[in-house]
């Protein structure tokens, strides 16, 4: 069908079709992504409410399903107040610098076999590079606000995000080593081959099992990277109020939270692609293969996002020194050690990947 649409479009519009088709595909990704963020916030409030033996949002619409729409309207109608002491240009650019990398990452994320905006061979490298740019927007927000609270929050964010990016990078390098490719689709396809996959038990052939420490480190580091609870000292309410966002209101404030929730979805999607077989079903059968691969990926991402929320509801906030100690003294040495083990494993006669 996609080939038919492409051929018809080229016949009608000629050279104008290619940029228009790229724009259409980008809109097809971004609009559902924004809806996912809206209802992820509702799911978070509902799930935490159930964990606390509360009802959660239930006033706007049936079962509270229109609550995200009401929240968006509220933020759109709020006055954007700009304190007199801020550096105006940098203050306005900072939220966009946080949001744009979070959206740009989706250009190379495959949703199913051959369903991707740009199927580049260096997709994994692109994700690692673009996702690390958002920290500059956080630093810029803290600096431009000319507030002590905002600056402290920005410095905490910079140190925390850089620290955990190292562990995440090492975890992804091990996936690169066993897959032998930087192409995200090739990494997913490589997980669905081998002894267990031939038996129809795909779930045991995925990377989560042989790379279990890396799987745990990558996901927990992702929680820290997104400044989510219990790693949310960047915006610890009892210490520095909203951290680098303290001087923002209205849509400026909303853009930071939009980027945070998009990054949560990115971490969950990358975890599913790198370690949980992507769009492949856990069991290879006629029934599971009848379900489109996109839905299997959505199910895995939804479960991982629910773990994000479960962690928030269950654990107290760590002290800043504990967060730094976990990153530098536990995760980085662990990932380096497992990287060496995997390298030896690949060169040994017991290599299970090739």
From Swiss-Prot:
Single GO biological process annotation from the record: aerobic respiration
List the keywords (alphabetical). Cell inner membrane, Cell membrane, Membrane, NAD, Quinone, Translocase, Transmembrane, Transmembrane helix, Ubiquinone
Per UniProt, subcellular location reads as:
Cell inner membrane
The record, for Pfam families, names: NADHdh
What EC number is given for this enzyme?
7.1.1.-
The UniProt entry's GO CC annotations, sorted and at most eight, read: plasma membrane
Spell out where the chain crosses the membrane: 22-42, 91-111, 124-144, 168-188, 203-223, 255-275, 291-311, 326-346
Q: Which reaction does it catalyse?
A: a quinone + NADH + 5 H(+)(in) = a quinol + NAD(+) + 4 H(+)(out)
Q: Which GO terms describe its molecular function?
A: NADH dehydrogenase activity; oxidoreductase activity, acting on NAD(P)H, quinone or similar compound as acceptor; quinone binding
Topology in the lipid bilayer: Multi-pass membrane protein
Asked if the record carries the keyword Cytoplasm, the reply is no
Under InterPro entries, the record lists: NADH_UbQ_OxRdtase_su1/FPO, NADH_UbQ_OxRdtase_su1_CS
Q: What is its main location?
A: membrane
What is its biological role? NDH-1 shuttles electrons from NADH, via FMN and iron-sulfur (Fe-S) centers, to quinones in the respiratory chain. The immediate electron acceptor for the enzyme in this species is believed to be ubiquinone. Couples the redox reaction to proton translocation (for every two electrons transferred, four hydrogen ions are translocated across the cytoplasmic membrane), and thus conserves the redox energy in a proton gradient. This subunit may bind ubiquinone.
Q: Name the HAMAP family on file.
A: NDH1_NuoH (MF_01350)
- Give the family, as the similarity comment puts it: Belongs to the complex I subunit 1 family.
What is the protein's quaternary organization? NDH-1 is composed of 14 different subunits. Subunits NuoA, H, J, K, L, M, N constitute the membrane sector of the complex.
Q: What is this protein called?
A: NADH-quinone oxidoreductase subunit H
> What organism is recorded for this protein?
Cupriavidus necator (strain ATCC 17699 / DSM 428 / KCTC 22496 / NCIMB 10442 / H16 / Stanier 337) (Ralstonia eutropha)
Give the gene name: nuoH
């Amino acid at each position: 069908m996609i080939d038919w649409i492409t051929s018809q479009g080229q016949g009608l519009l000629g050279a104008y079709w290619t940029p228009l088709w790229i724009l259409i595909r980008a809109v097809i990704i971004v609009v559902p992504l924004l809806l996912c963020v809206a209802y992820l916030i509702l799911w978070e409030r509902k799930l935490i409410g159930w964990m606390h033996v509360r009802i959660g949002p239930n006033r706007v619409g049936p079962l509270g399903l229109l609550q995200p729409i009401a929240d968006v309207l509220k933020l759109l109608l709020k006055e954007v107040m700009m304190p007199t002491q801020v550096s105006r240009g940098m203050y306005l650019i900072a939220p966009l610098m946080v949001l744009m990398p979070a959206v740009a990452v989706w250009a190379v994320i495959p949703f199913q076999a051959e369903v991707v905006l740009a199927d580049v061979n260096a997709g994994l490298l692109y994700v690692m590079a673009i996702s690390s740019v958002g920290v500059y927007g956080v630093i810029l927000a803290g600096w431009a606000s000319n507030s002590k609270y905002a600056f402290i929050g920005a410095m905490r964010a910079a140190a925390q995000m850089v620290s955990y990016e190292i562990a995440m990078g090492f975890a992804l390098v091990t996936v690169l080593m066993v897959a032998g490719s930087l192409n995200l689709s090739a990494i997913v396809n490589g997980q669905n081959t081998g002894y267990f996959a031939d038996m129809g038990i795909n779930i045991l052939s995925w990377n989560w099992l042989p790379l279990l420490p890396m799987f745990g480190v990558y996901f927990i580091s992702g929680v820290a990277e997104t400044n989510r609870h219990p790693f949310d000292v960047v915006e610890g309410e009892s210490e520095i109020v909203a951290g680098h966002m303290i001087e923002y209101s209205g849509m400026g404030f909303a853009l930071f939270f939009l980027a945070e929730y998009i990054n949560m979805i990115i971490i969950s999607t990358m975890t599913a692609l790198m370690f949980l077989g992507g769009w492949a079903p856990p069991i290879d059968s006629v029934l599971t293969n009848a379900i489109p691969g996109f839905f299997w990926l959505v199910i895995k991402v939804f479960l991982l996002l629910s773990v994000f929320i479960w962690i928030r509801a269950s654990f107290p906030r760590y002290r800043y020194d504990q967060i730094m100690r976990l990153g530098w003294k536990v995760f980085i040495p662990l990932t380096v050690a497992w990287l060496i083990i995997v390298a030896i494993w690949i060169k040994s006669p017991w290599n299970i990947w090739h």
